[in-house]
Design a protein with these regions (language model features):
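Hydrophobic alpha-helical segments
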Residues: 1-189
Length: 189
């Protein structure tokens, strides 16, 4: 095991393709550290590139689905799955995006009791149901998102973001990825 916690060897950064080395440099510049998700996923460099391209597309804010909403979905799914890495990392990102560490913490622990408005409650309920009980997701669940003010495209994004984090949670948990310590101090109340 290494400092990422991964059960797999983490490649030396110098051995990675140039596009990933540039991505790592940008992450360090923006965050002040290199997230372990990049280090661990670099075990399969081409897949990391594809995963990150998809991640970036899904995290583009829209009129009714903000960056904070998108991080909130990641947190709700990660909490439902018990994914340590993603819950810590996206919990930190949610606190930053909300500009409200208290609300971010409440959502991370129990979105139902966080004092969310009806739109955000509908988003969280959908993401959690798709995670915990996918076989029973139906048209009514989708309609709840639309009734909450999301466009069909934004409802699609809720579905796709939840699906991506279900995948990512399983990869992070399966590899034994540990969150960077730096996340713990970000945007705390």
């Amino acid at each position: 095991m290494n400092d990422t916690g991964s059960h797999f060897d983490v490649p030396e950064e110098a051995t990675l393709p140039e596009d990933l080395r540039k991505l790592f440099a940008k992450a360090r510049e923006r965050l002040g550290f290199l997230p372990n998700v990049f280090r661990v996923y670099s075990y399969r460099p081409q897949r990391l590139s594809a995963w990150f391209a998809h991640y970036r597309q899904l995290h583009e804010p829209t009129e009714n689905l903000s960056a904070a909403d998108r991080e909130m979905i990641a947190v709700v799914v990660s909490a439902a799955n018990g994914c340590l890495y993603c819950l810590v990392a996206h919990g930190a990102a949610l606190r930053v995006e909300l500009g409200d560490g208290v609300l971010g913490e409440r959502i991370s622990y129990d979105w139902r009791r966080a004092g969310l408005d009806a739109r955000r409650r509908a988003i969280c309920a959908y993401a959690e149901k798709l995670t915990r009980d996918p076989r029973n997701v139906d048209r009514e669940d989708l309609q709840n998102l639309l009734n909450a003010g999301l466009t069909p495209e934004e409802a699609w994004d809720v579905i796709e973001i939840a699906a991506m984090y279900n995948f990512t949670n399983r990869l992070a948990t399966g590899t034994n990825m540990l969150p960077n310590e730096e996340y713990s101090g970000q945007a705390r109340p």
